[in-house]
Amino acid sequence: MTTKDCGNHGGGGGGGTASRICGVIIGFIIIVLITIFLVWIILQPTKPRFILQDATVYAFNLSQPNLLTSNFQITIASRNRNSRIGIYYDRLHVYATYRNQQITLRTAIPPTYQGHKEDNVWSPFVYGNSVPIAPFNAVALGDEQNRGFVTLIIRADGRVRWKVGTLITGKYHLHVRCQAFINLADKAAGVHVGENAVKYMLINKCSVNV
């Protein structure tokens, strides 16, 4: 409903009353928006910190013609560094890429709320079966496998909302990028957690953009 609509509502003498009511509503909305803006500026929310703690490799096989089968379980930790602002994580998906090419399916992390100075730890599986790899990436990946070290990027994309007191903001895009250096040649570099599974401790700080 616009101010013009409010002025014409009801016709005759009722129009003035409707205009006043509409003016009060618009004024209230403006006050609320100004309040949110001022609170936002004063508190200055800080984006969360993410750390890739470890990766357990169950499978990582490159076969012809340029098909990659991989299966990981990763542990990723998030910390809300704000002392007065909570964070809602919405629609967060984790997956792996190699040289900007997605090599696993996206794994959804359940929506969650993170309070002030709180930590959350997730351990999702990310996997892909016979995923076609670009020929030039397959060559580079084969070279890395021959050297024993493979560099992947673990990504988390989603949306967050900030909670300031009883106020909750709109949704903001969240992009997390974590480098994973995996020593596939030396099994002793990790911990055997199964017949063919090796857990590698990483403790890598991730880049975060909101």
Swiss-Prot record:
Biological source species: Arabidopsis thaliana
Tissue and organ expression note: Expressed in leaves, stems and flowers, and, to a lower extent, in siliques and roots.
TM spans (from-to): 23-43
Keywords from the named record: Cell membrane, Glycoprotein, Membrane, Plant defense, Transmembrane, Transmembrane helix
Protein name, as recorded: NDR1/HIN1-like protein 12
Domain of life: Eukaryota
Record's subunit section: May form oligomers or be a component of larger protein complex in plasma membranes.
Signal peptide: none
Membrane topology: Single-pass membrane protein
Inducing or repressing factors: Slightly up-regulated by spermine (Spm).
Keyword check for Glycoprotein: yes
Role noted for this protein: May play a role in plant immunity.
Subcellular location: Cell membrane
One GO BP annotation of this record: defense response to other organism
Chief location: membrane
